[in-house]
Amino acid sequence: MSTALHKEYRPLTAEEISVLREHANSADDWSQVWVKEGFVPRYILNTHFSGWVRLGLFEKTFDLPGGISKHSGLYYTYLHNVEVGDNCCIEHVNNYIANYTIGEESFISNVDTILVDGETTFGNGVEVSVLNETGGREVLSYDQLSAHEAYFMAIYRHRPALISELRHLIWGYINALRSAHGTIGAHAHITDVGNITNVKIGPYASIVGTRRLYNGSINSVKEAPVSLGYSVICTDFIISSGSSVQSGTALSRCFIGQACTLAHGYSASDSLFFSNCHEENGEACAIFAGPFTVTHHKSTLLIASQFSFMNAGSGSNQSNHMYKLGPIHQGIMERGAKTSSDSYILWPARIGAFSLVMGRHTTHPDLSNLPFSYLIESCDTTFLIPGVNLKSVGTIRDAQKWPRRDARTDPHRLDQINYNLLSPYTIQKMLNGRTILTELRRVAGVTSEIYSYQSAKIKASSLRKGIHYYELAIHKFLGNSLIKRLEGVACTSIEVVRQALQPRTSIGHGDWVDLSGLIAPKAEVLRIIEDIEMRSIEGIGELQQRLADLHLHYYEYEWTWAYDKIQEFYGIDLTEVTAEQIAELVERWRSSVVELDRELYADAKKEFSLSAMTGFGADGDERVQAQDFEEVRGDFDSNTYVKSILQHIEEKSALGEELLGRLAPLR
């Protein structure tokens, strides 16, 4: 016990000990039971004390559901080496509570055992074998783990110095946690629970009906409480603020990020789930689930793969085992990629960003440079439809819903999340994809009906449209960047315009990478990596700040990249650009935006076709069918997403007109 803690408490008086004994309380050594001044012994009943015990005041009552009130105190419990904060209620502990500090106004009822057994780091330092089930890409789990740090540890194994130094930084944090004494934060609620061993519990946590918790941290905070529910079993785990683990979920060697939900018997081992993941019913093994990885279905297995912004259809499955050297294979589905019902992928494979996988695929394609594609199966053959997802209203709906569904309320956010559908990361892939498709057509000939790429087949019509869709998206992104850059600029002379277009930073040139949610220039990421390797970064806090700064300055860096690509793609020197050239870019941007929006509008209209009404108006004629459909689904023109598309066309057209108006005097 610290000196400060001794000063706060005093020994029991003989009179207080007498009253406690009258209430069927006992102690191995009453001299080791200390209390705060103002202590009243009447609210302690049938309790045994051993080791050192420190008791706060019992002055408040707890109002429980059903109109029940319970006064704070100790009832039918056993405490060993425990400090109890003010106004706690601890009752009906079937076995004992040992080696814990319990925060004020916590409620603990009907539990079996809560103990710390020897020195522990409370789930920090657990090696999580992600991606490769047999090991080799272990991520060191700890309380403050971000998706980006985990990405370094799992993906950058070709830089052993980085891995070594990053682990060194993290172990510095972990070793500071090492203790033989645990904490239960203030206002925690723990009821009807089995065994809790070596678990650190944050303030305002709710643990109700949980079966067993072993070696972990529940990092609840007031602004973002953690909730654990009935029949949950967790071993070697960390659960971050704002997350909910419910109804029979079983976790082993897992990190759960902020604002995640796992429920309905979900089972996971050796997996990482970062911000806003939602997992129900299914199973995960050795997955790197970046932000917004979602699965709801009992028949879905996610294994040995990396995801983010992903939705898994029912029956989605993958294999990391070819029955030769064991489960050693892995896969990557880049941000926004998703699977349809009953899809299957035999790893290794790499699926491009914002692509959709349908059917069974066993030929190990690498399609990272063909984003926004459909990967479908026909007659046991993989067919690729490049770029088609750019005109899918579902893609736009996804992009709009992710920011709205960010449920993080903790002011300290672990993950830096970029929601942009079009970014230097995806546009550089489209530029590569356009080159690939153009070269395929040149080499195989324009008269070919089928083209082959990475063990996938591409129909001639799909290839032609894919080039067109990529060009539309490139025009849209580069035009958006240009218009945004000139927003609010008084176009008094072409020199003023040229000056406004000049990048304010040299950061942003070259390739960009997606660090599981954080989109950043590769050169800057490598600079951070080199600083870690050279021990220029002295602690985890400094590393996290560097990553946050990358995210904060995204748009400045984006413009540096866009500035280069505008010159390269259009063959324009922006230091000598004319008003006419800018106007041409704006017109091209506007026509591309409108064409894509019209494609989205047409795609949305399919959801209101006659075939979509099948099953409506079951006992009526076509008039009843249409009326029933409209009552349930609404009118096409009043649909939220349809209206947003039309509004987008109007807004972008007006934005283009406004800039053209400012440029008019210079033309």
Give the positions of each predicted feature.
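Long, structured ligand/cofactor-binding scaffold of large enzymes
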Residues: 76, 85, 176, 193
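Long, compositionally biased intrinsically disordered regions
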Residues: 111, 378-667
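Long, charge-dense tracts
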Residues: 95-96, 100-102, 106-107, 112-122, ...
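Glycine-rich hexapeptide-repeat left-handed beta-helix
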Residues: 2-8, 14, 19-27, 35-58, ...
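Glycine-rich adenosyl-nucleotide cofactor-binding module
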Residues: 165-185
